Amino acid sequence: MTDIVTEETTVETPQGRLFAKRWRAAPAPAPAPAPGPGPGPGPGPGPARHAAAPIVLLHDSLGCVDLWRDFPAQLARVTQRDVIAYDRLGFGRSDRHPGKLDSAFVRDEADRAFAAVLERLGVDAFVAVGHSVGGGMAVGCAAAYPARCRALVTVAAQAFVEDRTLAGIRDAGRQFDEPGQLDRLARYHGDKAEWVLRAWVDTWLSPAFRDWTLDDDLQRVQCATLAIHGEDDEYGSDVHPKRIAARVAGPSSFLLLARCGHMPHRERTDDVLAAVATFLRDAPA
């Protein structure tokens, strides 16, 4: 059995402070050996466990550390790796974002907040795991740090701006116009909730973002890649995981989950955990 130890910290960046949390997959202490009949000392400690590269989670457009809920702890337990998650600037418990997102915000994450988190937490090699737009950011991180990224997992990620993506965002935007709906976001983002919503809806529906794709970054991903996607994802068809798997330079596969929408890690938690654990066990990660 593994005890999961959590640590919370802040990460200073030129734009503001970020909130980060780490789930350490520390092995539970072994019971002390029973004293033997002889006077000699008991057996010494066994060989130290090799520290596998930690998993860094990148959240979706409305997400934050707290909205991962118990998934990071479960992931740490099944993979026997540390898991790190952080709130991007403007989200959750991080500082306010000073302005609007520009059309390069997905790719820029690797060079800005992500890099600061790695430095602050002393992380060298890592596994990038991202949900939705966080999956696109995970691709960018794998592309930016090919010598350090040991493996990449995308969950319900978009590889380009599909009509289904825009339709889903428009529909969600209308739902948030209903009285009380913004309060759902405020529970996690506080008085930043309106900015979080507008950063998602307005950025993705902007004409300046219409031609965005992951193509340039995908071809620079050298590590093993797993693209997980729900067959009923309201924000993207199965073209996305297939495109991700087909265009990365390293070994790749995709997993389509039946009867699953845009939240595979919530809707099909056990399947996602098993897939990631198997993938990381088999990959040179």
Where are these regions (language model features)?
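Acidic catalytic loop of the alpha/beta-hydrolase fold
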Residues: D232-G236
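Short beta-strand/loop motif that positions the catalytic acidic residue
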Residues: V221, A227-H229
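Flexible "cap/lid" loop of the alpha/beta hydrolase fold
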Residues: G136-A144, C149-Q181
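Conserved HGGG/HGGXW glycine-rich cap/lid loop of the alpha/beta-hydrolase fold
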Residues: F19, W23-P29, P47-R96
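Active-site loop/oxyanion-hole signature of alpha/beta-hydrolase fold enzymes
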Residues: A85-F126
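Catalytic histidine neighborhood in serine/cysteine hydrolases
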Residues: A246-H262
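Catalytic histidine-centered segment of alpha/beta-hydrolase-like enzymes
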Residues: C260-L273
